[in-house]
Amino acid sequence: ISYQQQRDAAEAVVADVQTAGTRALAVQADVGDEAEVLALFGAADAQFGRLDALVNNAGVVDRAQTVAEMSVQRLERMFRVNTIGSFICAREAVRRMSTRHGGRGGAIVNVSSIASRLGAPGQYVDYAAAKGALDVMTLGLAKEVAAQGIRVNAVRPGLIETDIHASGGQPDRVERLAPNVPMQRGGRAEEVADAILWLMSDGSHYTTGSLVDISGGNL
């Protein structure tokens, strides 16, 4: 379990996993920094010995702005974490899981966003574009490694109750926009996790290259 800032939250997840009777490890890492990603995977190698699955869940958003207002620094951060970081992590996972590299196969699940197809105009076009790139990576990598025993899919959450809205300066965003969702509510993180678990499980062993929307019908 990697984290950048919320150590207590990461350690709480580790505790939950251990209570359930299995092992877990929390490692601080910035997924946009290659050296830190290499250290993260090295720690996992030392602790667990092999890799079976990767969930690319790291993501950032910024304050709502139009493209005309965005700085290069903001754009670089958005793509470094949301896109490049996922590429680096996927690369390291493939090197460990691919049957071509002596691995046993596995699954990669990228956490994208329905913003990738809606565009998020007037708010987060940069975030939407970074997630759109993640969608394309999902499709291309799925085809690239399918014969190597690795499945690659993505979930695209919609309006979900998480802290990311507060970090973007809109802590009330879910409550405010929920009436626009066909199901008339925001989603829960657990509902996204359920889809991720299915995509990592043997129940989806013939599914790869899929983009699964978890959006309450927000099309």
Where on the chain are the PLM-derived regions?
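Active-site helix of classical SDR
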Residues: A90, A130
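Alpha-helical segment proximal to the catalytic Tyr-Lys
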Residues: R95, K143-E144, H205
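Residue(s) in the substrate-gating loop at a strand-loop-helix junction
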Residues: S113
